[in-house]
């Protein structure tokens, strides 16, 4: 597992080779098997392959044109329709009545991370895209208002292999027993 983690990079340039459907299925299966609080599995993943629809998604991602080189986008959506009332000014503090949404976001982020790692294990490149506005992305994909879009993951065969970026040392990010 650590090999995949060390090997994975954010890819922003893909070949025009289509993804083998079996590989895509395995990547999605990894997300399905991700852990979640109380096994709620509060996620939905939208697989976008149609070029016009991908273009519409790219446009609401502040026109990050590099995205169009990926043949597939996987959109990670936290699904809390039955557990949380979504309102403007939603407070995501654990003391708020909507704290379950925060849990759904955390759980969905774990599943999305599994997508990133399994895609790499399948020889595919990915990049996490979180630069968009909820009210713009939802209509493009018909996502109901009571859902929360975490991110878009362009997926494809990498046309580049970027060098490793500097990472903070463990001594800077890990504390034992307390802050």
Give names to the regions the model predicted:
Residues 1-179:
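Acidic, surface-exposed loops and disordered segments
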């Amino acid at each position: 597992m650590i090999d995949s983690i060390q090997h994975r990079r954010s890819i922003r340039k893909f070949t025009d080779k289509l993804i083998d459907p079996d590989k895509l299925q395995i990547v999605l299966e990894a997300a399905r098997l991700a852990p979640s609080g109380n096994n709620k599995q509060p996620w939905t993943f939208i697989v976008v392959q149609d070029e016009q629809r991908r273009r519409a998604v790219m446009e609401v991602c502040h026109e990050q044109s590099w995205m169009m080189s990926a043949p597939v986008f996987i959109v990670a959506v936290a699904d809390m329709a039955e557990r949380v009332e979504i309102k403007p000014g939603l407070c995501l503090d654990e003391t708020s009545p909507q704290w379950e949404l925060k849990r759904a976001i955390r759980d969905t982020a774990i599943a999305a991370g599994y997508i990133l790692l399994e895609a790499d294990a399948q020889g595919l490149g990915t990049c996490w895209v979180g630069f968009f506005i909820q009210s713009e992305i939802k209509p493009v994909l018909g996502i109901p208002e009571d859902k929360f879009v975490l991110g878009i993951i362009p997926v494809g065969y990498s046309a580049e292999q970027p060098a490793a970026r500097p990472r903070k040392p463990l001594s800077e990010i890990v504390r034992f027993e307390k802050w």
